[in-house]
Amino acid sequence: MKNSKKSLMHVLSMSILLSLSSTSFAELVNNPSSGNSGTASLNWSSADASQFLNDEDDEPTPQGSTSVTTTLRGGSAPKIVASAPKIAPIRDTSGYNAQPSVSARAALVMDAQTGEVLYSKNTNASVPIASITKLMTAVVTADARLNMSEEITLEQIDFAGANGKNSSSTLRVGDKMNRAEVLLFALMKSENPAAAALARTYPGGRPAFVAAMNAKARALGMNATHYYESTGLDPRNVSSARDLGILVSTASQYGLIRQFSTTPTYDFNLGYRVLKSNNTNALVRNGGWNINLSKTGYINEAGRCVVMHTTVNSRPAVIVLLGEPSTQARNNDATNLLGWLSNLPKRI
């Protein structure tokens, strides 16, 4: 199990990605074993990181009501990378003794290498997934091989929300950052304007981006999944625990998604202000578990959700919890499942 010190060093190594050229960045996305060194373009201190590591940050709370419009940009959409996840077909072997009970509406624990379902609860139910949506947003963004150094300016439309909902945000209209920083905001801090901006600046705009999300889901065999937008605010964004197990296994193959989604804390230097930002998953912030990928989600219709790719006793595993009644219940269930995994026979 890794400790919080290792997690903080993980952030230092991650920050250099933000200053990479588009070519080296694209190579890193699909070649997680490659290494780079240099000076980070965003600065933060270990003392600041320690101060914010245990804060109870969670998903931005949906609030208010706005009308939704979209902006269609010219250009053709990039070719969708439709490779299947490198896991065995999912098969249910959940007859283990002393399985923990969870409060989640749906749950899955899967061996990410063999595809064995170690724990299951309503795994085929199609339910709202809130900001777990942003994991597919990240995959589509990475597949597009766009210039990650390109500057993006947040526009009012990025704050418009979806389906009559918007959410609180520390970002502002007019904030400027490169595409890598936008992706980091979307994964680590679950900022909805960041996810909206990634869709808006995709070739073909939001309609092409959402089409790519659904095409990727179909290509991966996520048959209970459908996306209407890129943030997760729309409760019509639905999936199943089974489908999300496939998505997490796929997303874990992208080095950048792994690093950005498991960054515990980060200072975003926007030039005229610095945003101290924390990961929305307390298990990532607090350390102690070997979590390789993480994404949380919340809207009223979805409840509290989390997906993780972890390694326990040399076993790569996926954990999915959907529809938890509270953040505390979500964290407790995730911790209990991780502990239960650690007591299973070790992989040889």
Each model region followed by its residue ranges:
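Short alpha-helical segments used as structural interaction elements across diverse proteins
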Residues: 2-3, 131, 292, 327
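Bacterial Sec-dependent N-terminal signal peptides
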Residues: 1-13
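Active-site-adjacent loops and short helices of periplasmic peptidoglycan-processing enzymes
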Residues: 28-35, 41-242, 249-255, 312
